């Protein structure tokens, strides 16, 4: 059920920039921890990346852990065909990138200069231009290999190696149906209460025990373990996530986030309702750097209305990153590290190492002209290098073409009562939403999510910075929303929901910060009259010089006739000098 109604923007508010917050994962663990000590072990979060291609599936699990830093082990369940050579350890960076790439985001729109008739530019258009100039994040758009004689192809500079890590684990694979608790006990570990009963339904899976070397643990905050992701590959179906096991160490609610990377399809849960969260709605500026707190509270409201519902928060091609991008698109080396290297093993040799096409006469002449002044030995070396480079470029172009995917993000918050069965994932129709651009004084934009042929779905929350300086033209073109001005000195960052498991659910109230009506959730902002329209949001046809709006850029101070607006503008300009330092967006006024 779609939760996002049509947008009507009612106001804006600002808050001074604070310190950056560091993104942290949030999800639920498909396994459990056992310790050699009496101190309780807790887990609040884990993220799961499931990468699929044909019969092959590669799963990466990054757990959260809170407990003693010595003498503990992690138990996961894997398909029966998994062997130790199919289990490896990754750097956390790869899962962190997926999280940042797909997380719900806060985007700021700025009213463009009403006296500048040029086209409106968006922040992601700037990003795309940079990518195009550099051959794209995966090397797409690089010169053809035939042009390598005169200009090096960008594919030559790609990192095309999968990265693995010498992790902190000692892996032991038990046979399906093995007595895991007995094995743990014989090795000095104490399984959590109820482990034996919880494991019974999973007799067809193999227990994977990862004993943790305390000397290799990375710490965050000085005393909390930050464990590396564990990756395994299988040719058996892996569409059911054994998440109920994570309840054995759960002190309260857990957040389950599943990333699915598939060549063609978006994914949803098949045994739970999947809905689209509100997207493309307006938020007060105070939520900008507290997106985790806001989203926690919003999801609580969603679950009250739609209990036991997964959120489909993101579905986008892997060579993109949303609008705006919170980080760069996934690199080919990252895709290989997350599982594409396994898929490459089944690619025929001729496809992995194709022959370069023959040079045309013009290309051959251009190359010979470029080496005609070299000494014989240098000429031979250059010819050999050129041949190798052409072969490398063709191979890498094929590699890039083979590894294009759709990245889906599913999110669920649960406890023992709201997870009666393990979630099952499956393909779903393509979805697009959260990308419509705002128009007019109120920044009206469609909040609808539609299914169709293209995956361009994101969860975006908007904030608007109306034009502050005095308008000095006769026919201003108002309310064109785009990217920040070139001379804006504030932090150019896309803020995302982060560290949900450790953020408050009550400090940021959706009833206060949401400025778009969402009747389905009972969120109906106060009528415009109570907030008063913004002073500078008057008629676009007002002749220059038009009064500026409230210098603080908050809600309006008045909407009277021209003389009243003129007085309000004078007061606004005075206030700008007082509060300018506390309002990053007032740097916008430097343009006048």
Where are these regions (language model features)?
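Surface-exposed, glycine/proline- and aromatic-rich loop segments on solvent-exposed faces
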Residues: 51-117, 185-209
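A cross-kingdom C-terminal cell-surface attachment/processing module
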Residues: 566-587
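Cleavable N-terminal signal peptides
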Residues: 15-16, 25-26
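C-terminal low-complexity, Ser/Thr- and acidic/Pro-rich disordered "stalk" regions positioned immediately N-terminal
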Residues: 520-560
